[in-house]
Amino acid sequence: MLNLLVITLPILAAIGWVTLNIQKPAREQWDRQFGDNKPF
């Protein structure tokens, strides 16, 4: 069980980190492109 956690936690952390790093520049680019008048 502990082995599974040791393997799984870094993978989840890496996936979360990558997701955040992908979303943040995309959101900044979105704001640059459309400004305040967002379609939703």
Curated annotation (Swiss-Prot):
The chain crosses the membrane at residues 4-22. It holds the Pfam family PsbY. GO terms for molecular function: manganese ion binding. It comes from the Bacteria. GO terms for biological process: photosynthesis. One of its GO terms (cellular component) is plasma membrane-derived thylakoid membrane. Its main location: membrane. It is found in: Cellular thylakoid membrane. The keyword Thylakoid applies. Keywords: Membrane, Photosynthesis, Photosystem II, Thylakoid, Transmembrane, Transmembrane helix. It is a single-pass membrane protein. Loosely associated component of the core of photosystem II (PSII), it is not always seen in crystals. PSII is a light-driven water plastoquinone oxidoreductase, using light energy to abstract electrons from H(2)O, generating a proton gradient subsequently used for ATP formation. PSII is composed of 1 copy each of membrane proteins PsbA, PsbB, PsbC, PsbD, PsbE, PsbF, PsbH, PsbI, PsbJ, PsbK, PsbL, PsbM, PsbT, PsbX, PsbY, Psb30/Ycf12, peripheral proteins PsbO, CyanoQ (PsbQ), PsbU, PsbV and a large number of cofactors. It forms dimeric complexes. HAMAP family: PSII_PsbY (MF_00717). Belongs to the PsbY family. This is Photosystem II reaction center protein Y.
